[in-house]
Amino acid sequence: APFAMNHSDWSKKDLEYIWHPCSQMKDYETLPPIVVDHGKGVNLYDVDGKRYLDVVSSWWCNLLGHSHPKINQAIKNQLDSLEHVIFANFSHRPAITLCEELMKKIPRGLCKFNFSDNGSASIESAMKMSFQYHYQTGNRQKVRFMSLSDGYHGETLGALSAGGLDLYSELYKPLLLDIVRIPAPDCYRCPRGKKRGCCQAECIDAAQEAFARHGDECAALLVEPLLQGSAGMRMYPPAYL
């Protein structure tokens, strides 16, 4: 019976059938995947009952902890009324209510919401929207994009093109878009020898030069908000943003 299997059994079965994302499958020969049974708060428990502290918040997505009673109840309530509906030509009250509440918290000038199911897909949609905007307003030469060096935007082709980390993109370079790359600010290892808080944000000069040189052909600039996570948690200087 499946529930009579131990953690080692489940790990072997996992590796027989599954490719895991963002990892080297060869590493699993010596460090098998942890097979999780359930979670509670900040803790995860494997199928043998061993407890783990979820210090990465399940890839930064679980801000309120596992099995939060309010969230669980809301999910159960929703399942009893509507589990899924096509979003083209249809809508539903939870989506409308959510957008209405979010509108109260976002900066002025932003007035519409577009849903996607993951970060990479949202980047792809944003790139297509920005291109289409310029195409429909007579700027059809704007067919390229700018992004910062060492950035990370996702694993799909457009998002991977915008990223600046060879660890993720080196193999796929023949497939990727031609991106205008701008040197990212790095206050910890400032190439100009400046100190954060005492400089004039000279790192913006490279961005201004890129805009002057390539602005007429670029549809958008892609920037991670607040910091570059995969580059080593690099915080942007406020003046740069």
Give the positions of each predicted feature:
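Active-site-adjacent loop/helix segments that line or gate small-molecule/cofactor pockets in enzymes
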Residues: 3-40, 90
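Glycine-rich loop-to-alpha-helix module at the N-terminal edge of alpha/beta enzyme cores
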Residues: 7, 51-140, 146
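Active-site and channel-lining beta-strand-loop segments
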Residues: 33-55
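Short beta-strands and strand-loop turn motifs
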Residues: 53-56, 183, 220-226
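A short, flexible beta-alpha/helix-coil linker loop
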Residues: 58, 81-82, 186-189, 225-229
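PLP-dependent aspartate aminotransferase-fold enzymes
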Residues: 100-219
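Active-site core of PLP-dependent enzymes with the aminotransferase class I/II
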Residues: 199-200, 206, 227-241
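Short acidic, glycine-rich surface-loop motifs adjacent to enzyme active sites
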Residues: 214-232
